Each structure stands twice: as C-alpha cells, then as structure tokens.
Regions:
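N-terminal cap/lid segment of alpha/beta-hydrolase-fold proteins
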Residues: 38-86
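Short substrate-entry loop that stabilizes the transition state in hydrolases
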Residues: 84-88, 93-141
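C-terminal catalytic histidine-bearing segment of alpha/beta-hydrolase fold enzymes
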Residues: 95, 254, 262-313
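Mobile cap/lid helix-loop segments that gate and shape the active-site cleft of serine hydrolases
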Residues: 103-105, 109, 194-231, 237
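Alpha/beta-hydrolase active-site loop
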Residues: 144-164
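Alpha/beta-hydrolase fold nucleophile elbow
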Residues: 166-177
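Short glycine-enriched nucleophile-adjacent loop
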Residues: 180-191
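Short beta-strand/loop motif that positions the catalytic acidic residue
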Residues: 235, 241-243
Length: 313
C-alpha cells in the first residue's frame, strides 16, 4: 500500500493535465471493447520488479488469505466471515500508491483528512477484502503497471464470490488514486461487480511517474490498454468516479465526463474536497447506500448536495 503522501499532489495534478499520451476519447466509430483489445496482447516489461516483502500479520480485524490468479497464489486481507448463516455484501478495495502491495496501512488509524483505510465499510459490517497483486509483497510474478493486475482483481472477486457468507450478487469494487485507475479498468473488463467506486483515477496513465510504469512507455499500445479514459464505452455496470475540486486528478475526471456517452458511468467533482479528504465522508456515504442496496439490481445514486455537504463552509 504505502499510503500516498500529500507530496504526491504535484504529480497528481500532472496526471490530470494534457500530455503526449493516449486520447481520452477513442477515434470515431471505434467501439472495440477493452476485453477484445487486450485479447492476445503480450505486455513487454522494461523492468521486472517485485516487492519481495512478506505480508504483515493483521490484527483481528482481518485474516490473511490467498486467492488464485493467473499469476499464481496471491495474498489478501479479508474480514472474518460472519457465522450467522446469512449472505452479506462485500467490497474489494484497491489502495493507492503501490497498489500491488498490502501492509498495515489498511488498518492503522488515520486522520479524517487523509484516511486511506476505507474503514467505513468494515465498520458498517460489510465484508472487506484488500488483495495484493502480482509482484507485490512476496507474490509470484512481476508488477505490470495496470495490465495483468486487472486479471488479479477479477480473480479476487471470484474468490470472494465463493465464500459462504458473501452474497455473490452484491460484490462491489472500490479504489483510490492508482487503485482508482485500476478499478476503472476492471469495470471496463467485466460486468461481475454490482457497482464500482473510483476515487481520483487517471484517465491516461502516461501522466504517472516511471515507478508506476515498468513497461516500454514509448509503445503507444501499451499505454492505450492501461488508460481507462479510452475505454469508458466498455463499462458494463454502474461506475461512480469521484474527485475533489481542490487538488488531485480533477482534470482527468472532467475529461472523462466530457468524452463519455455511457449511461452507466457517473462523474462527481466534490466541492471543497481534496484528493485525500474526499475519502472518509464519501466512503461512509457509500457504505450506508450499500447496506440499503438489496434489490435485484443496484439502486445506488448520489446527489451533489449529499456529496458536497461534509465540505460546506
């Protein structure tokens, strides 16, 4: 995880600016899905990186589990499963920063202005899972920078769906910053999530620093297949993208909102919030909506008033 520091904001602003990368808007008439575009493509890594760090033992809030992905068995933190015989909603959460690696940052108490733990979900009784990804911790494989990691996220969802206490029809996905970018790509690759919540994603990964891009960035196709702004038409379940108006990837959100014609994609800029302060109140709001989202299809929506209220001055 390695929580994103406030110093990252200068980089985040760059991510949201115009750059020589891939267009947020596919060429006219290009409706190839992300899944189709990825099929048969072999990424070529310029660097083979893995963290080589064991997964820290969690407190009783979580248990360490392993799930099967195309890269091999990967570690994750998962909430203890309720023993009440009922089916419960669950959420996969992808952290920001080094989203391939999990550590004690997912349970340490954090200030409300920078709470990257997404603890509102577990506090509401929602089953949580923080998956590590290929090349993270002491996992097999190498970091691919938003490519093979998409398959890992989908494999983690398959694992969750098999747990006896989890309602397989009420599995949600969320993530922040780099994790927000990855969950958008997952939403563009599968319809298996009831709803997806992406905080502060990039539309085009070309704006990220080299530490997040271990592939040949001069290869345009490598960038295209990792840039969610190009594949918004591929979204197949409700997706909600959030960013604060004060700092962060606001320009990326605005670019995607302008280019998207997909009715399943919703973009919310939250007045007065930053890339970090948006997390605590908005995840609490999402958790409350998940608990009420019990019908045959998701009924989750957001109003600007309820999103902006915690930041009103």
């Amino acid at each position: 995880m390695r929580n994103l520091p406030f110093a990252m904001l200068s980089l985040l602003v760059v991510v949201g600016c115009q750059r020589q990368g891939t267009s947020s808007n596919p060429s006219a008439g290009n409706q190839t899905s992300l899944t189709e575009a990825r099929r048969g493509f072999q990424t070529r890594l310029a660097r083979r990186e893995s963290a080589g760090e064991p997964v820290p033992a969690p407190p009783r809030l979580f248990v360490t589990v392993h799930y099967d992905s195309p890269a091999g068995k990967l570690a994750a933190y998962r909430s203890p499963l309720p023993q009440d015989g009922k089916k419960h909603p669950a959420i996969l959460w992808i952290t920001g920063g080094d989203c391939n690696t999990i550590d004690d940052g997912v349970w340490k108490e954090a200030p409300p202005e920078n709470d990257q733990t997404a603890s509102a979900f577990r506090k509401a009784g929602i089953i949580m899972m923080f998956p590590s990804l290929r090349g993270g911790n002491d996992n097999p494989g190498f970091k691919e920078g938003f490519f093979g990691e998409v398959d890992d996220v989908l494999a983690a969802a398959d694992y969750l769906a098999r747990q006896t206490a989890v309602d397989p029809k009420r599995i949600y996905l969320g993530g922040h910053s780099t994790g927000g970018t990855l969950v958008l790509l997952a939403a563009e690759s599968s319809d298996r999530f009831r709803a997806v919540f992406s905080f502060g994603p990039a539309d085009d990964v070309a704006g990220y620093g080299p530490e997040y891009l271990p592939f040949n960035t001069s290869d345009r196709r490598e960038l295209e297949l990792r840039s969610p702004g190009r594949w918004l038409h591929s979204i197949q379940s409700p997706v909600f993208v959030f960013e604060g108006t004060q700092q962060g990837n606001l320009r990326a959100l605005q670019a995607m909102a302008r280019s998207s014609s997909n009715s399943l994609a919703h973009f919310h800029s939250v007045r007065g919030a930053t890339h970090f302060s948006i997390l605590a109140p908005t995840t609490k709001l999402i958790a409350a909506k998940i608990l009420k989202d019990t019908g045959p299809a998701s009924n989750i929506t957001f109003s600007e008033e309820e999103l902006n209220r915690p930041f009103a001055r």
